[in-house]
Amino acid sequence: MTNLSRLPAALLVAAAFSLAACGDGDDGASEGRAETAATRDADLAAIKGYLLEHTARLVDDTAEIRAGAEDYFGLAKAARFDYARLLQEHREEVRGLVEDAQAAFAKANPSYEEMEGVVAGVPSLAEYDVIIDAGGDASEPDSAVPFDIETPAGRTFKQPGNFNFLIETTAYGTEPRFQAKGTQPDLDGDGEAEFGESLPDADFYLAAARDFEKYAKELDAAAREWEPTAGDALTALVVMTPTMSEYFAAWKNSRFIAGDQASEKAFVAASRLQDIADILGGLVLVYDNVQPLVAKADSQQARQTEQSLEQLHGLAAGLLARENAGHKFTAEEADTLGSQAQERAEAIAGQITQAAAKLNIEIEAG
């Protein structure tokens, strides 16, 4: 039996959605009437508008990534994919393209993270979170992405991981599988390969960039088709708010805390704290637009939940500001902060779950 507690949030939502479909018909009719009434009290159009703004941004950002990959592939092809020759003849051009790739990813990342709370928390959209940001590779069957990468040269990368991981680690050179083989990525010509110097496998990078753009467009289309319900919004809050411990663990294991000893290959373009703040910022927007509905269950509790969620967002933003100002957090501090954030997040999710029960609105989470 699948252990749902070990799955990414998006997979958990999708599994719960399937189980919910088997529920009692009379209960479903009652919940449907509650949903209809609830829709009048929540500004669901504002939530969808926020989502569409971000899916459109991601489409544009992935097009920029793909265009850069096309340019890099063309340069590598002209050198017959001889990467030593490529560096010898076009070192500055390669360096510029790699730096552009890193900048393009850094731009695309918040376009997704700011909407992740909605995408990962809504059953009809949750698979795209697995594809873009949460899914693992083939070594993790329960959470692996549902796609393979087919390259122009005819190679197949079976379930290689989510696209944020693929693009970031290729652009920054932190995943050797996606790098050119046999040539040191010495982009500045100083005789050493340092962190941030990358020589992507052009064949793989182009295929990954093209597919990233394809799935970004699919997400945009699915978001346009989505008809939001109050249950969707409350589910997103309940599922995505109490994910702090895993995010803080990724931060602890990243270069921002562990330095060269980092076990995380991703989260190098920006601190995981940035992602946490972006995700929580999106969830604050979702809650703001359903608070009038939650207040019908308990107005005082609704205000307390609002305050608690804003404080949790403020905690993440404050930690990020300290880190950006030069403070070096320790692994022990990351553990403590993660536990504190998770405790707060679980309390918030519990309050929203209670409100949904009083309103007879189903939360589609296991």
Whereabouts are the PLM-identified features?
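Sec-dependent bacterial lipoprotein signal peptides
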Residues: 1-20
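Mature extracytoplasmic or organellar-lumen-exposed domains after removal of signal/transit peptides
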Residues: 32-366
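A general secondary-structure boundary signal
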Residues: 20-21, 311
